Amino acid sequence: MLRSLVGSEMCIRDRLNTIQVKGRLEIIKTPGDYTLMIDYAHNAMSLESLLTTIRKYNPKKIYCLFGCGGNRAKARRYEMGEVSSKLADLTVVTSDNPRNEEPMDIINDILIGVHKADGEYVTIPDRKEAIKYCMEHAGAGDIVILAGKGHEDYQEIKGVKHHMDERDLIQEIIEGR
């Protein structure tokens, strides 16, 4: 009886050491010598926690790509812009789920917070192009974080959910599509 419990505990411990939750600090393999991660951080508190934690690993540079959902509190946009601008080396502002809002209106709200902290940033509304920008500019020792979408595999525009999985976008970029 004891032997079966010990065996089970060891299996559980081994499994816990290798478990990966989709969209939470999910590392995506790329041909580059930088680290690319997908995380669901979609508010200021989770983004601050993520960036503060990543900074402890002493990356050469942190790229933080994110957008904010439409038809949601505007304050979240300002706050996330400020947090990323303060804690990342480069903030890449893009589209998330604009829902029934214009993507550039959401991006402009995010930029209010970005400007408050006065960090370096670029604005690329098309999420695939924004990801491509990060992948092309990241270098050895850098960490690229794609924040906000996490496990989601869609982008909601004007009430319609369109398939969009960041993992697929990354693969398309790698393959030159």
Tell where the protein language model's regions lie, with residue ranges.
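Single conserved hydrophobic/aromatic residue that forms the stacking wall/gate
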Residues: M1-G7, C11-I12, T91
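Short, flexible loop segments at boundaries between secondary-structure elements
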Residues: H163-R177
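Gly/charged, well-structured mid-domain segments that form the phosphate/adenylate-handling core
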Residues: S8-Y40
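Short, well-ordered beta-to-alpha junction loops that form the rim of enzyme active sites
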Residues: G67, A147-H151
